[in-house]
Amino acid sequence: LWPAGRMPDRQPNQNYEPYLVWYIPEKPTTKAIQVIVAGGGYGFCNYVGEAEPVAYYLNQKGMTAVAVKYRCPRPQNGPKHLSAWQDAQRAIRKVRAEAPARGLDPNRIGIMGFSAGGHLTLMAATNAKTPAYAPVDEIDKLPCTLQWACPIYPAYALTDGADRPNTT
């Protein structure tokens, strides 16, 4: 997802590199792309339980899906979603950059996510013009705007972002 040595805000407790997995349908019915972000409370990424099954389902319907394996666990001493938000913005830009070579429409990209991924979906959709990180290469000149968003049981959305019920 990131060029070597250029990933922003790397944390020592984050145990893997973020990456994308493209799911290409055998019989495409659209040139649109669905980006998928799994949940896991920003403590882990439930990729196998949430992103993968949805990607396979969309492929059966003829739609290309791209699953994002974002950084976990959450950063130490910072906002729980920061690393994941950076990875989501970068993922959208990477998908947009690669779409034409794959015969897909770079202006028809949506995002969906579950739980913490639903929160990340809302962050990506409503903060596309707010950079989550400083540009690292040419890809970051591309917009990370989206054409649709599907937050599915988004965590933290109706609270102050705390891990416990909102008391304010």
Language-model features: where?
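N-terminal cap/lid segment of alpha/beta-hydrolase-fold proteins
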Residues: 1-32, 157-164
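Extracellular/periplasmic catalytic domains that process cell-envelope and extracellular macromolecules
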Residues: 14, 27-29, 60, 104, ...
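Short beta-strand element of the alpha/beta-hydrolase
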Residues: 30-40
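A fold-wide structural signal in alpha/beta-hydrolase
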Residues: 33, 59-69, 110, 148
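Alpha/beta-hydrolase active-site loop signature
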Residues: 41, 70-74, 156-157
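Serine-hydrolase catalytic-loop signature spanning alpha/beta hydrolases and amidase-signature enzymes
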Residues: 41-43, 65
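Catalytic nucleophile-loop/oxyanion-hole region of alpha/beta-hydrolase
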Residues: 46-48, 53-55, 68-106
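Primarily recognizes the serine-hydrolase "nucleophile elbow" in alpha/beta-hydrolase
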Residues: 90-167
